[in-house]
């Protein structure tokens, strides 16, 4: 059994290759992937070669942790899913010697049944956004967390963070965005250029820009006892001038990757209608054009979210 997969062979070297697919175990499901998302955070770092080293890191690798597909087969011990179910798959490790980091960008996947999440038919391609929504929710739902007064960055993660803040009953945040082309789609909240914002009393600032130099700018806008939440991923070391942080008794919190409970929580928000995933997927390519899709996803500022369509890939 084999599968067609996106393989990052090395920095800025990407191919669409046939790979051996491990045989499903009794507690696995086999999924025919319909769509997979391209992450402009994690996957950009893997593609560019800038991802910091961690256990299991190395090339070649299959990227992707945002896949939606249908269950083709279930193992003998699987009762949670049925053939034909539409599911969200947060990646897979089923390619033999080729690493899955995180292994979702392929036409077929073998995954433990407990790892996949059944989703409503109507979600369709928008289901790929559940991982990013869970990332935003994880930052918001931490013990003692304040909802953001200010969000830095109006990409997909920033938009989901703003939408979730409203969905969870918070006040409308302000959002900073330097790129004028991204100061749109702000239903219910204000998006401004940082230089046009005069406030210096924010209690809670969430950064999702990934800008390693954000701390001084953010701390300067905090109220006394305010908090900066680092919810992006930062390749370069972060630092800040101590005196302004000292004067404000500033706090800095780091939000890590989402957990299964976050994924289930955001799905409930979506299914109840409190959270919309509409208008966030802006670009699509057939999986056969993966090389073009990845370059556009990482190089075109008008591309908020790129997905690959695997349905017609031979």
Question: Where do the protein language model's features map onto the residues?
Answer:
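Glycine-rich beta-strand-centered segment in the early N-terminal region that forms part
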Residues: 22-38, 50-93, 122-124
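NAD(P)H dinucleotide-binding glycine-rich loop of Rossmann-like/cofactor-binding domains
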Residues: 80, 87-152
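N-terminal Rossmann-fold cofactor-binding loop
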Residues: 176-179, 208, 256
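Glycine-rich phosphate-binding loop and adjacent beta-alpha segment
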Residues: 212-272, 310-314
């Amino acid at each position: 059994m084999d599968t067609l997969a996106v393989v990052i062979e090395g920095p800025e070297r990407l191919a669409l290759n046939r790979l051996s697919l491990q045989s499903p175990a009794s507690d696995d499901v086999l999924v025919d992937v319909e769509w997979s998302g391209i992450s402009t955070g994690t996957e950009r770092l893997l593609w560019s070669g800038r991802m910091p080293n961690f256990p299991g890191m190395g090339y070649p690798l299959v990227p992707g942790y945002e896949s939606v597909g249908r269950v083709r087969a279930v193992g003998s011990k699987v009762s949670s899913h049925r053939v034909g179910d539409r599911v969200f798959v947060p990646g897979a490790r089923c390619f033999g010697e080729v690493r899955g980091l995180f292994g979702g960008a392929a036409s077929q996947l073998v995954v433990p049944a407990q790892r996949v999440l059944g989703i409503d038919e109507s979600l369709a391609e928008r289901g790929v956004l559940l991982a990013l929504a869970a990332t935003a929710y994880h930052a918001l739902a931490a013990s003692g967390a304040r909802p953001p007064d200010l969000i830095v960055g109006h990409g997909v993660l920033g938009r989901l963070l703003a939408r979730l803040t409203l969905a969870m009953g918070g006040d409308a945040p302000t959002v900073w965005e330097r790129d004028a082309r991204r100061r749109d789609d702000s239903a219910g909240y204000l998006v401004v250029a940082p230089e046009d914002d005069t406030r210096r009393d924010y209690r809670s600032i969430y950064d999702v820009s990934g800008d390693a130099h954000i701390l001084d700018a953010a701390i300067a806008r905090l109220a006394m006892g305010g908090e900066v939440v680092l919810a992006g991923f930062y390749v370069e070391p972060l630092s800040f001038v101590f005196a302004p942080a000292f004067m404000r008794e500033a706090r800095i919190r780091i939000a890590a990757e989402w957990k299964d409970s976050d994924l289930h929580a955001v799905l409930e928000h979506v299914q109840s209608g409190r959270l919309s995933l509409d208008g966030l997927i802006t670009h699509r390519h057939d999986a056969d054009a993966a090389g073009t899709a990845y370059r556009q996803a990482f190089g075109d500022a008008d591309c908020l979210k790129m997905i690959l369509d695997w349905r017609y890939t031979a």
